Amino acid sequence: MDLMPLEKARAIEIAFDNVFHNTKIPDNLQQFDAILKRLERRRFIPTENQKPRVYETELLVLRFREFGVKDNHNHPINLHSLRSKSLIRAQGKKLDLHNRVFLRRNVRAVKM
């Protein structure tokens, strides 16, 4: 199967869950950055044998809004931009990543 690396996907769709899940929290910004960097080398798993082919992986993103607010929209994402913006936000707010809520989001790449 021709798996597509995340950074080369022509279209990336993020399906945001309406229910937020607690996940293991990195205890510093370097670990958070490393999680996002690893996604760039990660391969998508084919969801079905269909055309256009759809591949799926998982993404952990730091939540910056109040807990309980639903985030159920779809939009394209750029991992490099996400990583830099997330780190800038975290550094700017001087967040303590302990006990922070991360979102578990399904990431789908569609190869046209």
UniProtKB/Swiss-Prot annotation:
Subcellular localization: Chromosome, Centromere; Chromosome, Centromere, Kinetochore
Full protein name: CENP-A recruiting complex protein mis19
Function comment: Component of the CENP-A recruiting complex that ensures the integrity of mitotic spindles through maintenance of kinetochore factors mis6/CENP-I and cnp1/CENP-A. Links mis16 and mis18 to recruit CENP-A through interacting with non-sense-mediated mRNA decay (NMD) factors and the SWI/SNF complex. Also links mis18 with the CCAN/mis6/ctf19 complex to promote CENP-A assembly.
An individual GO BP term: attachment of mitotic spindle microtubules to kinetochore
UniProtKB keywords: Cell cycle, Cell division, Centromere, Chromosome, Kinetochore, Mitosis
Known partners and oligomeric status: Component of the CENP-A recruiting complex composed of at least mis16, mis19, mis19 and mis20.
Ligase as UniProt keyword: no
GO CC, alphabetical: CENP-A recruiting complex; chromosome, centromeric core domain; kinetochore; nucleoplasm
Effect annotated for changing R65C: In kis1-1: Leads to defective kinetochore-microtubule attachment
Main location: nucleus
Domain of life of the organism encoding this protein: Eukaryota
Gene coding for it: mis19
